[in-house]
């Protein structure tokens, strides 16, 4: 069941990157 955690982390990383990009656009 190690792939579940890996998938979760990958999704979190993608979300974080999207938020950072949006933040930069707002600035």
UniProtKB/Swiss-Prot annotation:
GO terms for biological process: defense response to fungus; killing of cells of another organism; negative regulation of translation; xenobiotic metabolic process. Keywords: Antimicrobial, Fungicide. IC(50) of 20 pM in rabbit reticulocyte. Has weak antifungal activity toward C.comatus and P.piricola but not toward M.arachidicola. Inhibits cell-free translation in rabbit reticulocyte lysate system. This is Alpha-benincasin. It comes from Benincasa hispida.
């Amino acid at each position: 069941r190690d792939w579940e955690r890996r998938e979760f982390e990958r999704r979190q990383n993608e979300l974080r990157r999207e938020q950072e990009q949006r933040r930069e656009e707002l600035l």
